[in-house]
């Protein structure tokens, strides 16, 4: 009985790759230094899987930035602005595409399906000359082979690559990307040929777009692609891997009939309906890679339940064709529990990170083969039972309060236009008010202070003094820049979710539970293991302190319930919406306390609202209903003069704009600059929006400093579709990851651009 891993985290157990990348970008280390760290990480991952007994070990799931970018470089799909002259793509071109450079902007980055990982969006069109320009997949296969590990090279499948791309600038928006299939398949054939020549016997194509609602012509592209590749794939075993959701019934038929394919991988954690499809019929003689171990969460698998599922499949697939696998790449979970010595022992017994999931996969495969490790299974059963019965999981008062929310509407009593009038009388803001999204750069000194306070190396008084000094600097800087609505910069916060989770009951935290978000950026999601409540105020002291330093409005800064939910590892023993309602009630208590403390502008970030949207349209309405309801719960009951802002990230909002309007926030700021004003098209199409809105005027994910003219041009584009009296001027996102040398001139240019347009508007009257 065989075992398989879809993919594995790249960053390393202690984020070794992150630090190596950032050192290289800062010119503190060489390309060779970076390559050495990467090679050591790959080697240790392959060895770890081989030692654990995994039969089908993946290669080419490592990346210096992103696997879709790797595929674009493999195909030589480099936008002209990066001046790629042909040959093998090196770090300069690769990282310019990912991050931009002094003279050209980065490519767009967007969410990878409904996860918190981001991929670089390929820019394609009829003029792209595809060529085999990165031999990474073959090189990594050979590298593993030299170490004595025979791996399964993994490629993003050709159809998924095209479906995740976008038409390049200057190409018609309606350009049929799938028409490029004939142009990219010759490159795939070259790669496959080289892998075969190097000795590969298996190859994995990741085609996760198969779980989406696809149109018939899109489905036909899969049939066409694999028919075209069939002769090249001859002599290889081929896995087509899917993940993140159920496979639609029609898609299942097409997928399981693909030519040249030996095995199919399915997510059986999020795909219970797929299980029914398999039981209804599976192609004879094909392998089933059964994704029963959850790759997206940190809970130990219920091994008895997984084994039962696998046993039910044995009769359908055949014992020798059933392979135990993860539900998706382990990229989306933390790396190794061994690095968590301080985690509460009981909670720790309920968990499994990537390294432990590899062991679970192998234990299930051995159990199926009649070599069940009884002690391992008993220990797992005891942990499952302890989690079900632990008193720390349940709080009856919280359960009751959350249950009472169902079915009610919870909406502020007056309309948004009436509230905006009342707020303007109180705040007296200029036309095109300027603000920032919340965080300011976190210097090494600031991080040191927080670290030492956490380690009890400095006193609380010293810590408070240091944070107050930092807030004072940030307030002073914003006043000097003449920003209208200020923020305190969040110097006390390590992370916008962890900071709140640390002060809420029902949350646990890891020391090294890092997960890659994009590039070198990692997040450390909290673990929601029990019912959530707020024992004490969380932000009031710092917001009040900051407001006392200025006469200008100071925003209270909170993270919204849906974002806390979507950016945490969430308990899987109750529906997600129940946990979300509990968090909403905790945030509501905080909002009320901020208002009482004299904070007139409160931002409740819902950066991840869109990200939680189920992949299939049939499930959208239910999710949006409870997600939007949860947000509205947080700001009831407030005075009309209290202005509620919300902020959203990386999102294509056009399909959910009516739900966003239904959130009933007074002002919404949205990341917009990297998506070439995609958001504005919604308003061009006549959607009426009466609340304040601030589409980001510059990209904070790039070190590039935009000019006043560039920002003014962006504002003018916005004014072409939005009323002057509702438009706000702000960056895309928080400034935490940037340096002050980048932030000061960028904000200076932003304020200058707003003033320039104000003057033009005044003289045009």
From Swiss-Prot:
It catalyses: 5-methyltetrahydropteroyltri-L-glutamate + L-homocysteine = tetrahydropteroyltri-L-glutamate + L-methionine. It comes from the Eukaryota. One of its GO terms (cellular component) is cytoplasm. One of its GO terms (biological process) is methionine biosynthetic process. It is an enzyme of class 2 (transferase). Zn(2+) 2 binds at residues 658, 662. 5-methyltetrahydropteroyltri-L-glutamate binds at residues 18, 116, 495, 518, 521-522, 567. The active site is at residue 701. Pathway: Amino-acid biosynthesis; L-methionine biosynthesis via de novo pathway; L-methionine from L-homocysteine (MetE route): step 1/1. Zn(2+) 1 binds at residues 647, 649, 671, 733. Keywords: Amino-acid biosynthesis, Cytoplasm, Metal-binding, Methionine biosynthesis, Methyltransferase, Transferase, Zinc. Its EC number is 2.1.1.14. L-methionine binds at residues 437-439, 490, 605. It is found in: Cytoplasm. Has an absolute requirement for a polyglutamylated folate as substrate. This is 5-methyltetrahydropteroyltriglutamate--homocysteine methyltransferase. The gene is METE.
């Amino acid at each position: 009985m065989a075992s398989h891993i879809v993919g594995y985290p790249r960053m390393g157990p202690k984020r070794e790759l992150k630090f190596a990348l950032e050192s290289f970008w800062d010119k503190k280390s060489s390309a060779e230094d970076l390559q050495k760290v990467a090679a050591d990480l790959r080697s240790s991952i392959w060895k770890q899987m081989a030692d654990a007994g995994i039969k089908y070990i993946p290669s080419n799931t490592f990346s210096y930035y992103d696997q879709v970018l790797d595929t674009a470089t493999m195909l030589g799909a480099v936008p002209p602005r990066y001046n790629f002259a042909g040959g093998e793509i090196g770090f300069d071109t690769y990282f310019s595409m990912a991050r931009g450079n002094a003279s050209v902007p980065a490519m767009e980055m967007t969410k990878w399906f409904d996860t918190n990982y981001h991929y670089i969006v390929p820019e394609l069109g009829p003029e792209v000359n595809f060529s085999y320009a990165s031999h990474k997949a073959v090189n990594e296969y050979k590298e593993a082979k030299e170490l004595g590990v025979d791996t399964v090279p993994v490629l993003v499948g050709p159809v998924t690559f095209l479906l995740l791309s976008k038409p390049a600038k200057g190409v018609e928006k309606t350009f049929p990307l799938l028409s490029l299939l004939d142009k990219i398949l010759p490159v795939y054939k070259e790669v496959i040929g080289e892998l075969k020549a190097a000795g590969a016997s298996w190859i994995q194509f990741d085609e996760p777009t198969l779980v989406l609602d696809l149109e018939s012509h899109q489905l036909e592209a899969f049939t066409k692609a694999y028919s075209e590749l069939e002769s090249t794939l001859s002599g290889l075993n081929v896995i087509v891997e899917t993940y993140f959701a159920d496979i639609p019934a029609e898609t299942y038929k097409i997928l399981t009939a693909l030519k040249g394919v030996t095995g199919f991988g399915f997510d059986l954690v999020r795909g219970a309906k797929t299980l029914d499809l398999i039981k209804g019929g599976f192609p004879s003689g094909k392998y089933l890679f059964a994704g029963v171990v959850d790759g997206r969460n940190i809970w130990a698998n219920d091994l008895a339940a997984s084994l039962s599922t696998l046993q039910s499949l044995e009769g359908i697939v055949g014992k020798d064709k059933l392979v135990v696998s993860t539900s998706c790449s382990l990229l989306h979970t933390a790396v190794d529990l061994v690095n968590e010595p301080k985690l509460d022992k009981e909670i720790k017994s309920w968990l499994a990170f990537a390294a432990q999931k590899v062991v679970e996969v192998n234990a299930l495969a051995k159990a199926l083969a009649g070599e069940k490790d009884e002690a391992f299974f008993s220990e797992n059963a005891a942990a499952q039972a302890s989690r079900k019965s632990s008193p720390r999981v349940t709080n009856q008062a919280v359960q009751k309060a959350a249950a009472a929310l169902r079915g009610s509407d919870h909406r502020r009593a007056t309309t948004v236009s009436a509230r905006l009038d009342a707020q303007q009388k109180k705040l007296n803001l200029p036309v095109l008010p300027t603000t920032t999204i919340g965080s300011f750069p976190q210097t090494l000194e600031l991080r040191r202070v927080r670290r030492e306070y956490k380690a009890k190396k400095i006193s609380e008084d010293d810590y408070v003094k240091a944070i107050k000094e930092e807030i004072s600097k940030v307030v002073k800087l914003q006043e000097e820049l003449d920003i209208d609505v200020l923020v305190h910069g969040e110097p006390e916060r390590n992370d916008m979710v962890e900071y709140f989770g640390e002060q809420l009951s029902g949350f646990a935290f890891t020391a090294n539970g890092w997960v890659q978000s994009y590039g070198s950026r990692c997040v450390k999601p909290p673990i929601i293991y029990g019912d959530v409540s707020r024992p004490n105020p969380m932000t009031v002291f710092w917001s009040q302190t900051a407001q006392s330093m200025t006469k200008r409005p100071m925003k209270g800064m909170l993270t919204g319930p849906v974002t806390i939910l979507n950016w945490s590892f969430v308990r899987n023993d109750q529906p997600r919406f129940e946990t979300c309602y509990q968090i909403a009630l905790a945030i509501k208590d905080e909002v009320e306390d901020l208002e009482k403390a004299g904070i007139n502008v409160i931002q409740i970030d819902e950066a991840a609202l869109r990200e939680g949207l189920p992949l299939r349209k049939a499930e959208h309405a239910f999710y949006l209903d409870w997600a939007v309801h949860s947000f509205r719960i947080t700001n009831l009951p407030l005075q009309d003069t209290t202005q509620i802002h919300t902020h959203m990230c990386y999102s294509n909002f056009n399909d959910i704009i009516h739900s966003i309007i239904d959130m009933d926030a007074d002002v919404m700021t949205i990341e917009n600059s990297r998506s070439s004003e995609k958001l504005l098209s919604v308003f061009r199409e006549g959607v009426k929006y009466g609340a304040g809105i601030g589409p980001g005027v510059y990209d904070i994910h790039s070190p590039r400093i935009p000019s006043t003219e560039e920002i003014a041009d962006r504002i003018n584009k916005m004014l072409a579709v939005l009323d002057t009296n509702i438009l706000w001027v702000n960056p895309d996102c928080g400034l935490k990851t940037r340096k002050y040398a980048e932030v000061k001139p960028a904000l200076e240019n932003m304020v200058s651009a707003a003033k320039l347009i104000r003057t033009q508007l005044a003289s045009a009257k």
